[in-house]
C-alpha cells in the first residue's frame, strides 16, 4: 500500500489560482488476490460457502494473530516438528497465497517460550505476548515477548509478570494498557480435581495484573477472585473476557459470570452462573474451557459448545448456544437455537455481515474419527438460527485456531500437540457472501472496492472518508477487531457498525466515540453492498500510535555469481572449506597455501530449489555444491534430475541469529540451519541456545583467490 498527497485547486472569479493541500489519502492496494483465484467453486457455494484445498503449513499454529500490515503470525511448535514449543514464529503473507515465498520464519525469535501464552496489541503498535511455556524449553511462564510488526522482530526486554500465566487471557483495556486474567503454573490441568490443594500450592493465578510500558506489570490486588479465576472447574483456563460498553471488563469463566473494574487496585463483582457446571455427565451445558465465544455486536456475546474443563476430560460435547447482553447494569442471558452439531474445541469468528461462523470441534472431548465435526455452521443474529455450511477436509480440535483475513475469508489451521492429529496444514473457508448464484451455479460475487481512506490512522469520534473505485448501493460500514486467537477464543475480535452517508463514490463514516466500544488497537474496515457482499477489508489503527509497516521484513541478500567464503563469526580467521568432500571450518588466510584458499572458495548461485534462496558451488570442484545429507554437510555433484538434491543443496539467507552476518536455513528442512560444531559443518535444528546462535552465524567475505 502507498500514500500520496492530492492537491485541491480552485480558480477565483478574477482568474487568480489558489492551491491548497486538502488531504493525504491512504491508497488501498486492490491488486489481485491469489486466495480468490483458481478456485473450484461448488454449485452451492452461494448458500454454503466452500473450503480451499488443504495447504501445507510450516508449524502447528495453535496461536494466530493478524498483524497491522496484513500478514498472519502463527506459533506453537517448531518447524515440521510436532512438539510443544512456542519459540518459533512464522509470518505468512496472504497476498502471496500459498507459494514458496509466502512464509517467513523466525526460529527462536526470542528467549521466551510462548507456547500456550496470551497476546494483545499495545498502543505503540507492538504485540505483547505474555505467559505460556512448555517442557521443551523449561522457560518461565512469567516471561513476555514484545513483537514489533514494523520490523518483524521479537525481544524479551519486557518486565516479568508477577504470577505464572500459562493459559491466561490478555486484552487491551480502554486506556491502552494490557490486562492479564487467569492462568496458572504450566501443566496444572488437573487443578479442578483438588481445588484446595491447587490453592495451597499457589498453582493457579487468581489475581489479575495490568501492564503499561512505563511501569511494567502491576497486580490488581483488589480483584483477587477464586470465583472468576480459581481452580474450581478450571476457571483460570483462558477466561473469555471483553471490555463492556460501560468500560468495565466482563468475563465468563466456566459457568460463572463476573465484572472487573481495572481502576486503582481493581475490584471484581460476581454476577452468578448462567448454566450448570461443565462435565457433570447428566447435561451438556455450553460452558467450560472447551467452549467458544465471540462479541458479535457491541455488548452482545454468543457463547457456544463446550462442556469440558480440560482437553483430557472425556465428556460429551454441547450444541447449546447462549446470547449474553452486557449493555445494561446486569447481564441479560437467553438461549438461542442450538447448533446442528455438538462441539468441543470449536472456533468462532464474527464476519463482515455480522454473522458468526463456527468451525471444527468434536462431538466428544477431543476425539477425531467418527466424533470429528467437519461442516461449518453459520449463526444469524437476525433469525437466531444456524445454517450448516460446507465441510472441511481436516479435523480441527484442541490447539486449532481460526482468523478473519482482510479479504473476508477465514484461515483455519493448527490442531494437535497433543491430540489425535498434528496438523502441519491450513485451510481457508470462503463464506457464502463471497459468491452469487448465476445460471444454476455459484460464481465469485462482484465486490465493492475501497480506493482510498483519508488516513489509516484514526482517532475516536473522527470522520473517516472512504472513496470507492465506483459507486455502489451500500448497506453497512463496519469495523472488526483484528484477530488474536488461541484455544477456541479470539480475544481481540469485536464488531461495530459505523454511521455513514454516501455521495457518489465518497462515503463519510464516523469512528466510535467511545474507547469502551472499541479499545485502542487494530481493526479491519469493510463496506458492505446492498446484497451483503463485503469489500476487501482495510486495516486501520484506532487510538494507536502505529503507522503502516512494510508487509515483509527485508531479506538478507547475497550477490549471485560472486566468489565468496563463509566465515564463522565466533571463530575469527576460520573459513568454511571442504576436505575430502566434507565441509569443515579451518584456519585460512592470505598466507595459506593455494589448495586451502580454493577449498574455501564458493560461487553463489541462485537457489537450485528456490530462486529466493542460494546454493554454493565449489570453485575448484565445478558442478559440486554444498549439500545436506542426514545432518552432515559436504560436496556432492549436482544431479539435475533429482528434486531432493536441489532442496538439500539450497539454503535461505536469514539475519544472523546472534545479530551479526547471516544464518542459512535449509530449504528442504525448514528450521534446520548450517552450524559448525567440533570444526565440522552440520545441519541442525535450532535449539535456542546462545552457542547455537553463534555457531550458526557467518560473515560472507570475498574468496581468497
Where do the model's predicted regions map?
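Bacterial N-terminal signal peptides that target proteins for export
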Residues: 1-9
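Kelch-like beta-propeller repeat domains
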Residues: 24-551
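Disulfide-stabilized cysteine-rich extracellular repeat microdomains
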Residues: 69, 124, 135, 166, ...
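Short loop/beta submotifs within extracellular cysteine-rich repeat domains
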Residues: 153-154, 187-188, 386, 410-411, ...
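Extracellular glycan-recognition/adhesion modules and their associated mucin-like linkers
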Residues: 552-584, 601-632, 650-680, 696-705
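Bacterial N-terminal signal peptides
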Residues: 8-18
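Sec/Tat signal peptide C-region and signal peptidase I cleavage site
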Residues: 19-23
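Well-ordered beta-strand positions in beta-sheet-rich domains
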Residues: 497, 536-539, 599-601, 648-650, ...
Amino acid at each position: 500500500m502507498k500514500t500520496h498527497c492530492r492537491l485541491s485547486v480552485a480558480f477565483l472569479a478574477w482568474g487568480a489560482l489558489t492551491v491548497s493541500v486538502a488531504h493525504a489519502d491512504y491508497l488501498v492496494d486492490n491488486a489481485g488476490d491469489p486466495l480468490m483465484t483458481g478456485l473450484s467453486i461448488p454449485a452451492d457455494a452461494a448458500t454454503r460457502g466452500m473450503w480451499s484445498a488443504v495447504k501445507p503449513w510450516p508449524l502447528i499454529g495453535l496461536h494466530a494473530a493478524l498483524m497491522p500490515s496484513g500478514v498472519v503470525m502463527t506459533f506453537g511448535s517448531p518447524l515440521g516438528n510436532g512438539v510443544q514449543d512456542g519459540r518459533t514464529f512464522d509470518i505468512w503473507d496472504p497476498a502471496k497465497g500459498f507459494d514458496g515465498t509466502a512464509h517467513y520464519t523466525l526460529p527462536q525469535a526470542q528467549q521466551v517460550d510462548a507456547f500456550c501464552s496470551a497476546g494483545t496489541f499495545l498502543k505503540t503498535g507492538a504485540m505483547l505476548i505474555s505467559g505460556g511455556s512448555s517442557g521443551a524449553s523449561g522457560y518461565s511462564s512469567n516471561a513476555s515477548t514484545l513483537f514489533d510488526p514494523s520490523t518483524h522482530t521479537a525481544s524479551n526486554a519486557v518486565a516479568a509478570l508477577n504470577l505464572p500465566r500459562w493459559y491466561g487471557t490478555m486484552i487491551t483495556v480502554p486506556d491502552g494498557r494490557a490486562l492479564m486474567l487467569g492462568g496458572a503454573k504450566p501443566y496444572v490441568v488437573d487443578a479442578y480435581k483438588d481445588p484446595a490443594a491447587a490453592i495451597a500450592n499457589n498453582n493457579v493465578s487468581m489475581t489479575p495484573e495490568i501492564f503499561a510500558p512505563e511501569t511494567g506489570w502491576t497486580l490488581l490486588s483488589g480483584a483477587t477472585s477464586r470465583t472468576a479465576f480459581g481452580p474450581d472447574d478450571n476457571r483460570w483456563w483462558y477466561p473469555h473476557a471483553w471490555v463492556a460498553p460501560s468500560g468495565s471488563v466482563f468475563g465468563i469463566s466456566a459457568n460463572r459470570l463476573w465484572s472487573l473494574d481495572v481502576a486503582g487496585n481493581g475490584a471484581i463483582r460476581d454476577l452468578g452462573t448462567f448454566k450448570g457446571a461443565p462435565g457433570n455427565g447428566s447435561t451438556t451445558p455450553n460452558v467450560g474451557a472447551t467452549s467458544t465465544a465471540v462479541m458479535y455486536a457491541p455488548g452482545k456475546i454468543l457463547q457456544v459448545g463446550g462442556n469440558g474443563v480440560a482437553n483430557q476430560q472425556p465428556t460429551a460435547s454441547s450444541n447449546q448456544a447462549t446470547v449474553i447482553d452486557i449493555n445494561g447494569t446486569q447481564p441479560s442471558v437467553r438461549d438461542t437455537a442450538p447448533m446442528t452439531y455438538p462441539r468441543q474445541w470449536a472456533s468462532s469468528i464474527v464476519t463482515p455481515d455480522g454473522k458468526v461462523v463456527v468451525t471444527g470441534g468434536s462431538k466428544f472431548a477431543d476425539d477425531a474419527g467418527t466424533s470429528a465435526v467437519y461442516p461449518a455452521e453459520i449463526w444469524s443474529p437476525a433469525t437466531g438460527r444456524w445454517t450448516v455450511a460446507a465441510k472441511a477436509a481436516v479435523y480441527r480440535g484442541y490447539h486449532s485456531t481460526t482468523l478473519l483475513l482482510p479479504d473476508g475469508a477465514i484461515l483455519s489451521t493448527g490442531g494437535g500437540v497433543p491430540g489425535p492429529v498434528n496438523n502441519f496444514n491450513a485451510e481457508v473457508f470462503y463464506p457464502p457472501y463471497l459468491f452469487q448464484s448465476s445460471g444454476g451455479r455459484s460464481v465469485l460475487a462482484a465486490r465493492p472496492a475501497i480506493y482510498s481512506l483519508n488516513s489509516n490512522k484514526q482517532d475516536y469520534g473522527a470522520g473517516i472518508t472512504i472513496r470507492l473505485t465506483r459507486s455502489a448501493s451500500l448497506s453497512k460500514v463496519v469495523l472488526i477487531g483484528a484477530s488474536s486467537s488461541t484455544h477456541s477464543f479470539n480475544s481481540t475480535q469485536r464488531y461495530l457498525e459505523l454511521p455513514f452517508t454516501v455521495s457518489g463514490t465518497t462515503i463519510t463514516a464516523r469512528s466510535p466515540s467511545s474507547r469502551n466500544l472499541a479499545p485502542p488497537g487494530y481493526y479491519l474496515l469493510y463496506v458492505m453492498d446492498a446484497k451483503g457482499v463485503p469489500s476487501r477489508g482495510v486495516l486501520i489503527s484506532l487510538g494507536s500510535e502505529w503507522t503502516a509497516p512494510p508487509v515483509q521484513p527485508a531479506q538478507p541478500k547475497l550477490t549471485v555469481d560472486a566468489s565468496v567464503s563463509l566465515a564463522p563469526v565466533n571463530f575469527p580467521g576460520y573459513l568454511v572449506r571442504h576436505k575430502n568432500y566434507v565441509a569443515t571450518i579451518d584456519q585460512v588466510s592470505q598466507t595459506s597455501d593455494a589448495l586451502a584458499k580454493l577449498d574455501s572458495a564458493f560461487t553463489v548461485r541462485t537457489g537450485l530449489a528456490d530462486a529466493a534462496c542460494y546454493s554454493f558451488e565449489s570453485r575448484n570442484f565445478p558442478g559440486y555444491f554444498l549439500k545436506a545429507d542426514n545432518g552432515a554437510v559436504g560436496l556432492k555433484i549436482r544431479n539435475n534430475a533429482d528434486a531432493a538434491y536441489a532442496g538439500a543443496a539450497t539454503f535461505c539467507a536469514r539475519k544472523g541469529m546472534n545479530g551479526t552476518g547471516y544464518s542459512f536455513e535449509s530449504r528442504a528442512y525448514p528450521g534446520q540451519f548450517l552450524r559448525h560444531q567440533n570444526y565440522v559443518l552440520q545441519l541442525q535444528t535450532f535449539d535456542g541456545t546462545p552457542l547455537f546462535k553463534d555457531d550458526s552465524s557467518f560473515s560472507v567475505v570475498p574468496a581468497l583467490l
